[in-house]
Design a protein with these regions (language model features):
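Solvent-exposed alpha-helical segments within well-ordered globular domains of core cellular machineries
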Residues: 35-39, 66, 70, 94, ...
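Intrinsically disordered, low-complexity glycine/proline-rich and charged
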Residues: 122-162, 237-248
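Helical mechanochemical/support elements of P-loop NTPase systems and associated helical scaffolds
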Residues: 22, 30-33, 60-64, 88-92, ...
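Short, ordered loop/turn segments at secondary-structure junctions
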Residues: 26, 80-81, 113, 136-137, ...
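Domain-level signal for Mg2+-assisted phosphodiester chemistry and nucleotide/NA-binding surfaces
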Residues: 2-95, 100-101, 130
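Acidic beta-strand-to-loop metal/phosphate-binding motif
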Residues: 53, 106-113, 120, 124, ...
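Intrinsically disordered, low-complexity linkers and terminal tails enriched in Pro/Gly
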Residues: 2-17, 156-180
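N-terminal regulatory modules in eukaryotic regulatory proteins
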Residues: 137, 162, 166-255
């Protein structure tokens, strides 16, 4: 085994799971996606803080009420003090800052489609913590780009709850469509180039970490649950499975 590979595996084995704080803007996202969001966050760590913000006297949040207890989500009441003003945003920001200063979380997840939270994301990032974003496809680009990654919740909805147009979005994008996405191809090739060893091979986990640190990319938005599956679909990289098939290495097929 290559010394660098052994060191990387040792680092991964002693790394503690992330403690994630999930804050939900119930006014701006569908309750139907919460199961998918929690499943996705399980890839990154343990969601030990789950706060759902909104005015729970509002009939529009009735769907969320049924999701609270089954998923151990704590409702955070915020009354609408002034008609036409959304007090939930301010309360959610205060909640996030309290959690940030507590030092008891390692990452944040924001479930919202409101770009007003972009400054909050940037502030959390300044403290060295990642922010996982979840929102609708209408979410403004500044918020999407600030998160790493950002997942469109339409891709996380149960199939039986999805609209016909959503089911199309969730289909895996094929080889030609993926290759036609210049931004995606550039991102993948750059990530491999920046994380590869002298022989050109890069550990997929390191590639994924580079992408996470430099973009809002998520394989789910392309119809794939895992980065490795998307990489295979592009057919742009040579692939080697090492350590009895447990470690995936990729190399730019042009080299």
């Amino acid at each position: 085994m290559h010394p660098l590979e052994l060191l990387y595996q040792l680092e991964m084995s002693v790394t503690k799971p992330n403690r994630i704080a999930l804050l939900i803007d119930c006014d701006n996202v569908s309750h139907n996606a919460i199961e998918g969001v929690l499943d996705e966050l399980a890839k990154y760590g343990t969601v030990n803080v789950r706060h759902a913000h909104g005015d729970w006297n509002s009939p529009s949040l009735s769907g969320w009420i049924d999701r609270l207890h089954p998923h151990a989500i704590r409702p955070m009441q915020q009354f609408a003090y002034t008609k036409g003003k959304n007090a939930t945003d301010a309360a959610m920001i205060i909640d996030a800052m309290d959690l940030l200063y507590s030092g008891n979380v390692d990452a944040f997840a924001l479930m919202t489609s409101d770009s007003d939270f972009t400054p909050l994301v940037l502030r959390i990032l300044e403290s060295g913590l990642p922010v996982y974003g979840f929102g609708q496809r209408k979410t403004p680009k500044p918020f999407v780009d600030a998160c790493s990654p950002f997942v469109y919740i339409e891709n996380l909805l149960p199939l039986e709850d999805s609209k016909p147009c959503v089911s199309v979005i969730r289909e895996n994008k094929g080889r030609n469509e993926l290759r036609g996405d210049a931004a995606l191809v550039r991102l993948l090739r750059t990530a491999v180039d920046q994380t590869s060893e002298d022989d050109g091979w890069a550990h997929l986990s390191r590639v994924g970490q580079y992408i996470s640190n430099n973009s809002s990319f998520s394989a789910i938005n392309y119809g794939y649950k895992k980065l490795g599956d998307l990489v295979r679909a592009t057919e742009l990289f040579d692939i080697e499975m090492r350590n009895d098939g447990k470690a995936m290495y990729i190399k730019d097929a042009r080299k």
